[in-house]
Amino acid sequence: PLRLVGSEMCIRDRLTSGGDAPGMNAAIRAVVRSAIFYGCEAYGIYGGYQGLINGDIKRLRSQDVSNIIQRGGTILKSARSTEFRTEEGRAKAAAKLAEHKIDALVVIGGDGSFSGARLLIQEHDIPVVGIPGTIDNDLYGTDSTIGYDTAVNTAVEAVDKIKDTASAHNRLFFVEVMGRDAGFIALRVAIATGAEAVLVPEIDTDITDLEHFLEKDYDPKQSSGIVIVAEGDKAGGAYNVAQKVGEAHPEYDIRVSVLGHMQRGGSPSAFDRVLASQLGVAAVDALMDDQKSIMVGIMNKEIVHVPFNKTIKNSKGLNPELLNLVKILSNR
């Protein structure tokens, strides 16, 4: 990213690392075009940190990011790199930046991507600004991450379809959504689809309590039911929970649906496109102001700068009011 040309700073590089999220292309577009707006050059690193180590770097012009704002995935591709986790790997990455006369970096990703960026800063003093891009919405210091809104809408659309077939047969469906360590997707999907219950990693699941709740709320002869399960739920995911409930209640007609990677794909929502555009420009602005080792986020509709140390070390908790909302609205 940044190169000194006379008295001007020029943004030079950006990469997407870790899991992809809808809206990353909109963020890439915003970084490239805002850099060009300031009279700077923009480069893309293909394949995340491993691509940086390999020197897979290409200049991006305005036309290169035309017609990508509506596309899911990332034109820069994304990958996890075990080599970058070593000091030798990071030294190679820093050498490639120096070789291409790159002075700063914009990283779009989650806490793993930012942890790698922080090490690059500590060991090689390279300015890095992060843009939160993860469907999990689990990054401290921002109300929403790029991709979260789209993932929720994708899951809601799928669950609505599942509810149709569940209703036709009076079935109880356990629907698993993404969320290995966080239940933000599960919680919002549960509220939006009128689910009977939601199981999230942040709260230990008591199967007996769930069974008692379903006994009151679900009549297999007269109604259907939906339970939303985050993949990281401590009871072991939707299949394990469904099996345990089924053993206790063989009269239930139980089915399981795992939504999986469909939640990462698809055209980003309008909300994610706007958010990505805002944060992409904010990242360039931060580098132009000599900021480094920060994530740009949005809190209460305002752009904020959050130190990497803070967003990596702190956890973002679920809203207890929303958890209570599921309980209140599930009563029949």
Question: What kind of region is each of these model predictions?
Answer:
Residues 1-11:
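Single conserved hydrophobic/aromatic residue that forms the stacking wall/gate
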Residues 7, 52-107, 113, 146-153, ...:
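Glycine-rich oxoanion-binding loops at beta->alpha junctions
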Residues 12-19, 74-79, 103-107, 173-176, ...:
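Short glycine-rich or small-residue beta-strand-to-loop segments that form or flank ligand, phosphate
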Residues 29-56, 67-74, 253:
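Anionic-ligand anchoring segments at beta-strand to alpha-helix junctions in alpha/beta enzyme folds, i.e.
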Residues 29-38, 58-64, 119-130, 146-150, ...:
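A glycine- and small-aliphatic-rich helix-loop capping segment at beta-alpha/alpha-beta transitions
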Residues 244-332:
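C-terminal non-catalytic interaction/assembly regions of soluble proteins
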